[in-house]
């Protein structure tokens, strides 16, 4: 459960991410593909080379979804319901992949945000991404 402090940290750091959200999410996705090669199996039609237009476009989709989640942090299930349906029923993404992507997103944010990425922000953002992952996998059951 996200505390009021967690929500404040997430909103504040997302504000610092700002216009770089799509870029950072694409970088996190690319890190995921390199660090956990089995995740590539869900993207057989993608050009997975560094900086490809497809990775950039999917990074923007991830960033947009996370931005909506931040904006509606008190209603993650309602906000992410359609994405949950898509990933569970149509794409059938293995739930573990959300944890892998979340980890790579945290690494990417840490690399870019420097001193703003405090231990408290790290913990809150980790909890937030875990909450998002839980919602995205909720329709699997």
UniProtKB/Swiss-Prot annotation:
Heme b binds at residue 87. This is Hemoglobin subunit alpha. Heterotetramer of two alpha chains and two beta chains. The modification N6-succinyllysine is found at residues 7, 11, 16, 40. GO terms for molecular function: haptoglobin binding; heme binding; iron ion binding; organic acid binding; oxygen binding; oxygen carrier activity; peroxidase activity. Keywords: Acetylation, Heme, Iron, Metal-binding, Oxygen transport, Phosphoprotein, Transport. The keyword Metal-binding applies. O2 binds at residue 58. Red blood cells. The modification Phosphothreonine is found at residues 108, 134, 137. It comes from Macropus giganteus. Residues 1-141 form the Globin domain. One of its GO terms (biological process) is hydrogen peroxide catabolic process. Involved in oxygen transport from the lung to the various peripheral tissues. InterPro entries: Globin, Globin-like_sf, Globin/Proto, Hemoglobin_a-typ, Hemoglobin_oxygen_transport, Hemoglobin_pi. The modification N6-acetyllysine is found at residue 16. Belongs to the globin family.
């Amino acid at each position: 459960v996200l505390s009021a402090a967690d929500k404040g940290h997430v909103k504040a750091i997302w504000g610092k991410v700002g216009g770089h959200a799509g870029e950072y999410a694409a970088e996190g996705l690319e890190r995921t593909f390199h660090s956990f090669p089995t995740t590539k199996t869900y993207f057989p039609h993608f050009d997975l080379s560094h900086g490809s237009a497809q990775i950039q476009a999917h990074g923007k989709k991830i960033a947009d979804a996370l931005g909506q989640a931040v904006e509606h942090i008190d209603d993650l299930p309602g906000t992410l319901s359609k994405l949950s349906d898509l990933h569970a029923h149509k794409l059938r993404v293995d739930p573990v992949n959300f944890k892998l992507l979340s980890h790579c997103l945290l690494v990417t944010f840490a690399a870019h945000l420097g001193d703003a990425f405090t231990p408290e922000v790290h913990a809150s953002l980790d909890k937030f991404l875990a909450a998002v992952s839980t919602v995205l996998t909720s329709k699997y059951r």
